[in-house]
């Protein structure tokens, strides 16, 4: 029915494109008329458009300036200031709408100017990344359509080789005419710098400035780059700069402007693949013990060995039962299913288990038993697990220690509860009801109980992470070990992620497992998810070759529509049906035979793998056949440029992990078109259809011929976890023999269903993450807005007096109702250094309101005398340092509290409570307490700080700013159990300096990647700090003048 309707009315994408053709015709009309203009006249057209936009919005901008001037009035009440601020926000919304209206009007002329400029540059040489580049690009009509879509704040899906980099220039040029800045977001530093140098000639021709944010730039250079009309950079750099700006101690330290318009290259990679990994700036945890993992490792190793032996025994007995003739017996079927289920939950990657599950009816027996035990919220699943030492839920990436496992790990001379958490509630109740204990004894007992709980919970957590490291994470698959370090391999690209670390102690557990040095732990200082960071932009757009499959997620989370752009030339690549084998061994043999066949024909082949281990296995098999080939994986990434450059040549065989699937452009050598173009041979389906489409997209660029096919086995992770049961039964019915290959529509549909299930599960995780982070996002906005206002304002007296009014009201109410005059005087004196001097009669006669006025007026008089004594400048510094210092300190403590809350919140589900609802309620309570503490301590600092203390505090703030540059760590970390009910893609943390190495990696255009190590920066003065030479001048005016 849907196809019938599409035939009549056309698909959504057809209708989207149809609406844009009239604009393309208008662009081309202007383009033809501009050909006769001189260069100066063409530049003049750009200036005309700028003036036209400025004229359209100038009155609205002037209104904002007028309102902001009113905010500088120190006599305003807080209510009046808030009213003006609300009015400004309304006018800014009006300004944004008017700006978009003006840009839409000039779009055809602006795009025509870019097209004509590109035509004039054809044949001209200029340097790009140290090489000479000859300009040879003029936008096609389909590229103009892509540019219009980007300007409209949508996602433009364009096939490989269709010139996305040039497409981005069109809306970038248009939106840069406003002077408010455009950010172009790439996936690494190399692409940011390359694209900037590549496209700069067009922008500079019209006097627009272009910058690039790179990982190793100092703050003052970043500020210069952000001030440009157009700024290229990575999502991490933009995000971390936002967090750093909200930790700045001086307005001059803020590097970014407002978030106006961003275009994200490879938008699906950034907004979907990276969405589960929050950006986190963290600092070292003082006195953290990193040896705890090594201490407990021997016990875990013994436990894992015992489990392996137990599973081997279970499988031996199950194999005998499978081969006996009484399989029709229901009890026998149940026992076979139970044995297989125990093996699956004890060691799911066991080779014998994977082999047995492929036996006729075995998978059905196991599924029947599992369904039985999963009834009533898995109430009886413990009966399956109690025979094991620990149970593994591979789909959800969780491990649980059983009672049998706890007893096994506890030494004979130790407390039998060595790995059991005490029941704090029950024990506290016992202590409180024990009449033999004094109050002091009770306090001591409770402290001992809390310490015991803390020690044991940490011990159990360490065991859990070590078990995950030994049972769920495989070397040369999820990670590699190089130069004594555990390095994570990106599951989506196959590249090593230097500097990234798994979170929540998992990385330390892997380091203990591999016997390398265990690095220290960190604590969160500032955090935001990429999802919420990119929502800060007034307008957001993106481009990629694969977005259509995730269109619903883009719209639901980001309100971004996906438009598929037609190709300039028709795609002639042949995408063949999947070939399905029963075992990996059969599949690999078939892959080698196909490679041999293609090489004899002279056709180049790119073999895509999902892990380092598989790529090396295939490489060994090819060597045995004496077939020349290149391997490209996380261990050989330095050779990437050379390998990719030769991958399209005659007889070339290239084995590559997913790193060859994105950002690479394989060009065909001479005579390759005649033999069929590049052949793509995928050795396994990825859990995401997008990654498979990326691999297919390496062939068939710009109308080139090519072929793609996937070889799949039932032992592949995707099929084993999500899709093999029905496929096995079909293969059994078809009488499948070893070595047979199946090409069946039902099997292909089963694979697609499996992928959809995983995609839906991952979408649910990302959506859940967003729901949790929205709680933090609202709190973050309140704190950062409050902080930014304090940072930018010269005086904060209005805010201080507003806090004072609240303080006076609350204290008057509290102490008047308690009839505690002395307590009130003592507390006000202690917190504000103000003596309110109340007699008993005055206390009784004034009443609650009168006492509040007395506190307020006495404190205001004190504050004004202090102001007269110290002067406006010093008071402004005291106010600012009070507000910023307290906000920073309390926000860090709040983030630690939130981290603690997340760790245990999922346990509330066992009490039939919704963890998300519980999290929202608990987080709100913590936030209310945070605001109260910030208000009280800010007020106290503002009143009690005097010049000597202020001077010390003044040096403290820039010191913190410097520490931020030297010691703080920028992390990219995935949500733990509080966020997800399924396996995270990669729970990682990224060290800011070490991550420079990752950002500097070229996808396929550098001769040799420079190997980078984590950079430890020596302490350097800030530009506004006193020069260390002792001259008394600021560093930027002394020895830092040329820095």
Curated annotation (Swiss-Prot):
In which organism is this protein found? Chloroherpeton thalassium (strain ATCC 35110 / GB-78)
Q: Where in the cell is it found?
A: Cell inner membrane; Cytoplasm
Complexes and interactors: Monomer and homodimer. Part of the essential Sec protein translocation apparatus which comprises SecA, SecYEG and auxiliary proteins SecDF. Other proteins may also be involved.
Q: Where is the composition biased (Basic and acidic residues)?
A: 1008-1022
Query: Could you read off the lineage of the organism from its UniProt record?
Result: Bacteria, Pseudomonadati, Chlorobiota, Chlorobiia, Chlorobiales
Q: Where is this region: Disordered?
A: 980-1043
Main location class: membrane
Q: What is this protein called?
A: Protein translocase subunit SecA
Residues reported in the UniProt entry to bind Zn(2+): 1027, 1029, 1038-1039
Q: Where does ATP bind?
A: 143, 161-165, 665
Relate the protein's function as given in its record: Part of the Sec protein translocase complex. Interacts with the SecYEG preprotein conducting channel. Has a central role in coupling the hydrolysis of ATP to the transfer of proteins into and across the cell membrane, serving as an ATP-driven molecular motor driving the stepwise translocation of polypeptide chains across the membrane.
Which residues lie in Low complexity bias regions? 980-1005
């Amino acid at each position: 029915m849907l196809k019938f309707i599409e035939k009549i009315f056309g698909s959504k994408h057809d209708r989207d494109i149809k609406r844009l053709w009239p604009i393309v015709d208008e662009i081309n009309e202007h383009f033809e008329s501009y050909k006769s203009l001189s260069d100066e006249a063409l530049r003049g057209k750009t200036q005309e458009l700028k003036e036209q936009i400025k004229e359209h919005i100038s009155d609205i901008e002037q209104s904002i300036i007028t309102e902001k001037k009113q905010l500088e009035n120190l006599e305003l009440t807080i209510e009046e200031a808030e009213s003006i601020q609300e009015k400004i926000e309304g006018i800014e919304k009006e300004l944004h709408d008017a700006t978009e209206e003006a840009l839409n009007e000039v779009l055809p002329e602006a795009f025509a100017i870019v097209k004509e400029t590109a035509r004039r540059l054809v044949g001209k040489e200029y340097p790009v990344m140290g090489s000479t580049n000859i300009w040879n690009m003029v936008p096609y009509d389909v590229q103009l359509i892509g540019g219009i879509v980007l300007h409209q704040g949508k996602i433009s899906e364009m096939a490989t080789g269709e010139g996305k980099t040039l497409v981005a220039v069109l809306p970038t040029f248009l939106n840069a005419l406003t002077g408010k800045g455009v950010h172009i977001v790439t996936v690494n530093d190399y692409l940011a710098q390359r694209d900037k140098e590549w496209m700069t000639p067009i922008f500079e021709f019209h006097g627009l400035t272009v910058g690039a944010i790179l990982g190793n730039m100092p703050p003052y250079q970043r500020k210069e780059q952000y001030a440009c009309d157009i700024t290229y950079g990575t999502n991490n750099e933009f995000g971390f700069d936002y967090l750093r700006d909200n930790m700045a101690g001086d307005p001059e330290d803020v590097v970014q402007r407002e978030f106006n318009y961003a275009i994200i290259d490879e938008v699906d990679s950034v907004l979907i693949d990276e969405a589960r990994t929050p950006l986190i700036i963290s600092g070292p945890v003082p006195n953290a013990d990193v040896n705890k993992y090594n201490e407990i490792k021997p016990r875990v190793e013994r436990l894992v060995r015992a489990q392996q032996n137990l599973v081997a025994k279970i499988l031996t007995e199950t194999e005998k039962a499978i081969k006996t003739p009484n399989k029709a017996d229901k009890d026998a079927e149940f026992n076979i299913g139970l044995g297989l289920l125990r093996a699956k939950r004890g060691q799911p990657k066991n080779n014998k288990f994977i082999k047995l599950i492929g036996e006729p009816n075995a998978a059905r027996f196991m599924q029947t038993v599992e369904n039985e035990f999963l009834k009533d919220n898995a109430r009886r699943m413990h009966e399956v697990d109690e025979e094991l030492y620990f149970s593994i839920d591979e789909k959800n990436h969780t491990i649980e220690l059983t009672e049998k496992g706890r007893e096994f790990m506890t030494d004979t001379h130790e407390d039998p509860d060595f790995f059991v958490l005490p029941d704090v509630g029950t024990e506290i109740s016992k202590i409180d009801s024990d009449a033999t204990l004094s109050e002091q004894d009770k306090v001591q007992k409770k402290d001992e109980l809390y310490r015991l709980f803390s020690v044991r919970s940490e011990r159990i957590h360490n065991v859990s992470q070590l078990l995950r490291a030994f049972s769920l994470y495989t070397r040369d698959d999820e990670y590699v070990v190089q130069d004594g370090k555990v390095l994570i391999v990106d599951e989506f690209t196959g590249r090593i992620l230097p500097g990234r670390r798994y979170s929540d102690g998992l990385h330390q557990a892997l380091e203990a497992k591999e016997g390398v040095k265990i690095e220290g732990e960190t604590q969160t200082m500032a955090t935001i998810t990429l999802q919420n960071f990119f929502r800060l932009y007034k307008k957001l757009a993106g481009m990629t070759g694969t977005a259509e499959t995730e269109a619903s997620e883009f719209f639901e989370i980001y309100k971004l529509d996906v438009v598929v752009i037609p190709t300039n030339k028709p795609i002639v690549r042949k995408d063949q049906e999947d070939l399905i084998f029963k075992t990996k061994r059969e599949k690999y043999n078939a892959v080698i035979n196909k490679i041999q066949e293609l090489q004899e024909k002279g056709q180049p082949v790119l073999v895509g793998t999902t892990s380092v281990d598989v790529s090396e296995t295939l490489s060994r098999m090819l060597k045995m056949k004496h077939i020349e080939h290149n391997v490209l994986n996380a261990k050989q990434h330095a050779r990437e440029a050379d390998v990719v450059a030769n991958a399209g040549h005659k007889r070339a065989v290239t084995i590559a992990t997913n790193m060859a699937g994105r950002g690479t452009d394989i060009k065909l050598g001479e005579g390759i078109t005649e033999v069929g173009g590049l052949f793509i041979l995928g050795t396994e389906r990825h859990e995401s259809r997008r990654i498979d489409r990326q691999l297919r997209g390496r062939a068939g660029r710009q109308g080139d011929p090519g072929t793609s096919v996937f070889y799949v086995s039932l032992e592949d992770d995707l099929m084993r976890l999500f899709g093999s049961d029905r496929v096995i039964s079909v293969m059994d019915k078809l009488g499948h023999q070893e070595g047979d290959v199946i090409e069946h529509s039902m099997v292909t549909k089963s694979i697609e269903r499996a992928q959809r299930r995983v995609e839906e599960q991952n979408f649910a995780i990302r959506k859940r993450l967003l729901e949790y982070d929205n709680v933090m996002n609202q709190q973050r906005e309140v704190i950062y807005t409050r902080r930014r206002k304090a940072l930018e304002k010269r005086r904060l007296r209005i805010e201080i007096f507003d806090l004072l009014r609240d303080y006076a009201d609350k204290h008057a109410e509290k102490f008047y109702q308690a009839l505690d005059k002395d307590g009130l005087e003592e507390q006000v004196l202690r917190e504000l250094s103000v003596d309110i001097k109340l007699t008993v009669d005055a206390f009784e006669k004034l009443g609650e309101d009168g006492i509040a006025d007395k506190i307020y007026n006495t404190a205001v008089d004190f504050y004004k005398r202090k102001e007269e004594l110290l002067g406006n400048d010093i008071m402004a510094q005291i106010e600012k340092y009070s507000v910023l210092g307290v906000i920073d300190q309390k926000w860090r403590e709040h983030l630690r509290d939130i981290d603690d809350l997340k760790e245990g919140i999922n346990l509330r589900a066992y009490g039939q409570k919704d963890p998300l609802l519980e999290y929202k309620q608990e987080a709100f309570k913590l936030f209310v307490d945070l605001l109260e503490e910030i208000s009280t301590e800010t007020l106290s600092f503002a009143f009690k700080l005097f010049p000597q203390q202020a001077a010390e505090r003044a040096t403290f703030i820039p010191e913190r700013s410097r520490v931020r540059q030297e010691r703080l760590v920028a992390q990219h970390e995935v949500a733990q159990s509080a966020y997800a009910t399924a396996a995270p893609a990669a729970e990682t943390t990224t060290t800011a300096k070490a991550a420079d190495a990752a950002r500097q990696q070229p996808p396929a255009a550098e001769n040799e990647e420079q190997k980078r190590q984590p950079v430890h920066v020596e302490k350097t003065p800030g530009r506004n700090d006193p020069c260390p030479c002792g001259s008394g001048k600021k560093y930027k005016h002394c020895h830092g003048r040329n820095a």
